[in-house]
Amino acid sequence: MDYSGVYPSSSKVYVRGNLYSDVNVGMRKVAIKNGTSEFLVYDTGGPYTDREAKLDIKSGIRKLRSTWIENRRDTSPVQRSFVPSGSSCTRYQKAAENVLRKIAGGSPVTQLFYAQNGIITPEMEYVAIRENALRMQVGSSETGAAAHQEITPEFVRQEIAAGRAIIPANINHPESEPMVIGRNFLVKINANIGNSAVLSGIEEEVKKMALAVAYGADTVMDLSTGSDIHNIREWIIRNSPVPIGTVPIYQALNKVKGVVENLSFEVFKETIIEQAEQGVDYFTIHAGVLKDYIKHARGRVTGIVSRGGAIMAQWCLAHNKENFLYTHFDEICEIMGSYDVAFSLGDGLRPGSIDDANDEAQFLELKTLGELVKVAWHHGCQVMVEGPGHVPMHLIKENMEKQLHLCSEAPFYTLGPLTTDIAPGYDHITSAIGAAMIGWYGTAMLCYVTPKEHLGLPNIDDVKAGVISYKIAAHAADLAKGNPSAYARDYALSQARFDFRWYDQFNLSLDPLTAKSLHDESLPGKGGKTANFCSMCGPKFCSMKLSKELVDQ
């Protein structure tokens, strides 16, 4: 699973911190031929984009944050509450030797708690260095998102303390390389993986994760609903350099053999403790699906399309009781604060079709999520809020404006949104359009959609298509927000294009191998890579060639 080859002419370099000597931030250096000694880009690939790294799925990857966590002296080693079993566990026993830690005192062990108490953690310095790649001074954008000359560790601390940003960083996932989610930082993307009752297994899902992070996924969600959920998640976490998210209600339902009526808070509590001990960095919790809101979704074209939302709605109606995720929310906060698991407050009533966008059910839930944001903050927990869904372009901005107002500027994390319903097989495109727009307006993280959306379980090629589509959307949003590092890369590639430096164009792109292979189809070999034209226009009609001749005159 070495993906360093997907970036020819690139190498991994490490930038050392100033506040903490053991902070070394991995970035990718692209070699280009115009005399520039280095071009650094943000890199999410961890060891998978490092040619020098030794990879072994059975051992897991390096535990980058172990010393930082131990040095804070607010956690201690404990025994697992849940002991994994099964053949897959035996096969990967080395990775299972991860030391389990839990809160040792009375205060939360969260990045929010540290930030609010004036502490700049190594994680905060790490993300400041990552965000600073190629930044230069620009003003703030019209959307209100700050584009600062420099992202300092103190600025990161302030954003975390205010709740405008989060660093998902479970104390039991020391392998993760810290990253920040907030609208005053680079727009991030998430890739969903996971098995179903029909398809996939451990090796396949770990390969999907590795490919996703190599191509730029900032976080990965394991949405497994089939068999062996615990062990699949274990090997994903032990091998993941990015934060891992889950929807715990899926495994809780699996524990009661798929019978929604048999769910209980006790089963759910056991599940989130199990997953927190493994190292899951954020949980999607559908606590805003209240019993009285369900009736508002009955007249929709597509009803309730969130799996978690539908599960909780069915449970509420079966028992004629309020959602137990809502009634036990304080206890959930206490558990999550003990491991620094961040909340991703799920939009269980999100619209699943254009006709249902921005309806009463959606915004009633959003108001409740805003109230729960404050409860989570009160407990010292980090929190972001999930959003739609299926929304036509003219209604997208309203979603961002309402979320900022109702949720006190907690980071927004949206699935797309898909801007039309007519393109099954191409929903990575329909959704990337909406994702670029809502990212521009202020969404902090975009959940990818693959070509298989609405059609089936994504395979590894679908994962790549989804990641690349959303890297484009996030980058377009960063450009619109005035982020200087986004402009720097566009400028460098445009220069290479005008100079007919074909290899530099390929290597500065999001997917160099694909760019080169498409060029090779018509102009293969060394001659094609020195030509001052491409097969579209040929040597006589190339506008850039003609323009360059004018400049040279």
From Swiss-Prot:
GO BP: any one term: thiamine biosynthetic process
Cofactor binding mode and count: Binds 1 [4Fe-4S] cluster per subunit. The cluster is coordinated with 3 cysteines and an exchangeable S-adenosyl-L-methionine.
Catalytic activity entry: 5-amino-1-(5-phospho-beta-D-ribosyl)imidazole + S-adenosyl-L-methionine = 4-amino-2-methyl-5-(phosphooxymethyl)pyrimidine + CO + 5'-deoxyadenosine + formate + L-methionine + 3 H(+)
Binding, substrate: N192, M221, Y250, H286, S306, R307, G308, D347, G348, L349, R350, E386, Y413
GO cellular component annotations of the record: cytosol
UniProt keyword terms in alphabetical order: 4Fe-4S, Iron, Iron-sulfur, Lyase, Metal-binding, S-adenosyl-L-methionine, Thiamine biosynthesis, Zinc
InterPro entries: ThiC (IPR037509), ThiC-associated_dom (IPR025747), ThiC/Bza_core_dom (IPR038521), ThiC/BzaA/B (IPR002817)
GO molecular function: 4 iron, 4 sulfur cluster binding; carbon-carbon lyase activity; zinc ion binding
Cofactor(s) in the UniProt record: [4Fe-4S] cluster
Any Pfam family hit: ThiC_Rad_SAM
The keyword Membrane is annotated on this UniProt entry: no
Source species, domain of life: Bacteria
Pathway terms, separated by semicolons: Cofactor biosynthesis; thiamine diphosphate biosynthesis
Binding positions ([4Fe-4S] cluster): C534, C537, C542
Alphabetized PANTHER family for the sequence: PHOSPHOMETHYLPYRIMIDINE SYNTHASE, CHLOROPLASTIC, THIAMINE BIOSYNTHESIS PROTEIN THIC
Function text: Catalyzes the synthesis of the hydroxymethylpyrimidine phosphate (HMP-P) moiety of thiamine from aminoimidazole ribotide (AIR) in a radical S-adenosyl-L-methionine (SAM)-dependent reaction.
Name assigned to this protein: Phosphomethylpyrimidine synthase
Species in which this protein is naturally found: Anaplasma marginale (strain St. Maries)
Lineage, opening ranks: Bacteria, Pseudomonadati, Pseudomonadota, Alphaproteobacteria, Rickettsiales
Gene: thiC
